[in-house]
Amino acid sequence: METSLETLWSQVLERLQLQLSRPTFETWIKTANAEQLDENRLVIRTPNPFARNWLQKYYVKTIRDVVHEILGHPVEIQIEIAQGDSNATISAPEVASPPPTASPVENTNTSQRQQASLNPKYVFSRYVVGPNNRMAHAACLAVAESPGREFNPLFLCGGVGLGKTHLMQAIGHYRLEISPNSRIFYISTEQFTNDLIAAIRKDGMQKFREHYRAVDVMLVDDIQFIEGKEYTQEEFFHTFNTLHEAGKQVVLASDRPPSQIPRLQERLCSRFSMGLIADIQPPDLETRMAILQKKAEYENIRLPREVIEYIASSYTSNIRELEGALIRAVAYISISGLPMNVENIAPVLNPPTAKISASPESIINAVADTYGISIDDLKGNSRRREISMARQIGMYLMRQHTDLSLPKIGEEFGGKDHTTVMYSCDKVSDLQKKNPELAQSLRQLGDRIKLANQP
């Protein structure tokens, strides 16, 4: 039986969504389209050259294997740029390669770096790349090489201590290596607001505007703190427009995407979203170990592997805590004179409580009890609105609080298909962003589930 292009691509998307992380799927796969299917060739089109190069470099083999599995015979995967973008010239950088320039610490143009408020340690060569940050790292390299062209603005979002500031400042260092006379400006949103207030008090708005709009690359940290500040938003809107229209690069960092920043003017939200939004997730175990190893190398510290594994396994939420634990361990060993091993450092580290992996039964019981629904109904096929919604919430919570795959979650709910689980998780995730009551209910259920699963 011949498979149509639409059917094939739908099946490919379903399988890739199971294999890849959600940020990867949403950013690189979901934005692509299958355009043509011949006997031995599938043509896939991407929205821009960066996406094309990224798919070609990292995911073409995965796509080829999935298509082969569906069709029953091998096909060539050809990735092209969608019509209208064929003249674009930016290509993806080598992600794992540091910039081919001298270390900023050893460079002589110190005054420019000080004026730009750049930390000498925040360079690309000291940034550890893993699955959690590969897209953001590659996008920052692309911006550093060709500012104001492909991703403008570039919006980095991720939790506290995940490396957003490091990447932003690495862009500044890179530009100053290539072009020492570049005007690089790294600021926090708080600094922008304080400077604006001072300018208003001193009748210095003209000087303020000249200062902030005469830059080549503007790097703005913690942009989420602009929320609710109407006059700051007004001034930043015009500053952003002036820079963007002049082809100057703007890079923004936040702990959440633009659409989730409360009391943000719609026009600013639109502008923040019109470039690339690159998400940074907490690092996995291997990346955390690599971060510790690199930190130890730069500080000329010898660490046994078991110590690296212990610290990396104990601190999972962010890089600042991870590096802070390493510093405490090294300081204690240095002062005490004891050998560096897990037994000696464990008492002084006091790692945070490990994330509790919940049992599926505890989640089902909590949801059934909260919504007054029997477990049989929750696992059944009833389409009654209140039962269906509770079932979707249960699937979402099981996705959040267990390591079960989508098919396994489906089995826990009476043998539901993995696509049903996928739809349910996406629906609840979207609804909670618009419904504060649902978000609060999910938090309370999450706390209840954690309490029920404590040892």
UniProtKB/Swiss-Prot annotation:
Main location as per UniProt: cytoplasm
Region (Domain IV, binds dsDNA) residue spans: 334-455
Source domain of life: Bacteria
Pfam name, any one: Bac_DnaA_C
Matching SMART domains: AAA, Bac_DnaA_C
Residue ranges of the region described as Domain III, AAA+ region: 117-333
GO molecular function, one term: lipid binding
Region entry Disordered, spans: 92-116
Listed InterPro entries: AAA+_ATPase, Chromosome_initiator_DnaA, Chromosome_initiator_DnaA-like, Chromosome_initiator_DnaA_CS, DnaA_C, DnaA_dom, DnaA_N_dom, DnaA_N_sf
Subcellular location: Cytoplasm
Stretches the record annotates as Domain I, interacts with DnaA modulators: 1-73
GO CC annotations, alphabetized: cytoplasm; plasma membrane
Keywords, in A-Z order: ATP-binding, Cytoplasm, DNA replication, DNA-binding, Lipid-binding, Nucleotide-binding
CDD domains: AAA, Bac_DnaA_C
Assembly information from the UniProt record: Oligomerizes as a right-handed, spiral filament on DNA at oriC.
Protein's job: Plays an essential role in the initiation and regulation of chromosomal replication. ATP-DnaA binds to the origin of replication (oriC) to initiate formation of the DNA replication initiation complex once per cell cycle. Binds the DnaA box (a 9 base pair repeat at the origin) and separates the double-stranded (ds)DNA. Forms a right-handed helical filament on oriC DNA; dsDNA binds to the exterior of the filament while single-stranded (ss)DNA is stabiized in the filament's interior.
This protein's name: Chromosomal replication initiator protein DnaA
Source species: Acaryochloris marina (strain MBIC 11017)
